[in-house]
């Protein structure tokens, strides 16, 4: 179900908008946002 919602979002939103949103998140300097993204990345890709 989670995958279906993700794919639906990708088809409904313009790809350029998704790329820009991802870029904004990647450049974010707000500590709690930045740290949350780093932790999620490390957990997802099993980084030690």
From Swiss-Prot:
One of its GO terms (molecular function) is phosphatidylserine decarboxylase activity. Binds 1 pyruvoyl group covalently per subunit. It catalyses: a 1,2-diacyl-sn-glycero-3-phospho-L-serine + H(+) = a 1,2-diacyl-sn-glycero-3-phosphoethanolamine + CO2. It comes from the Bacteria. Its EC number is 4.1.1.65. It is an enzyme of class 4 (lyase). The keyword Lipid biosynthesis applies. GO terms for biological process: phosphatidylethanolamine biosynthetic process. Pathway: Phospholipid metabolism; phosphatidylethanolamine biosynthesis; phosphatidylethanolamine from CDP-diacylglycerol: step 2/2. Its cofactor is pyruvate. The keyword Membrane does not apply. Keywords: Decarboxylase, Lipid biosynthesis, Lipid metabolism, Lyase, Phospholipid biosynthesis, Phospholipid metabolism, Pyruvate. Belongs to the phosphatidylserine decarboxylase family. Type 1 subfamily. This is Phosphatidylserine decarboxylase proenzyme. It comes from Azotobacter vinelandii.
């Amino acid at each position: 179900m989670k995958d279906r919602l993700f794919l639906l979002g990708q088809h409904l939103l313009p790809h350029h908008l998704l790329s820009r949103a991802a870029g904004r998140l990647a450049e974010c300097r707000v500590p709690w946002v930045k740290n949350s993204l780093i932790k999620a990345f490390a957990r997802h890709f099993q980084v030690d």
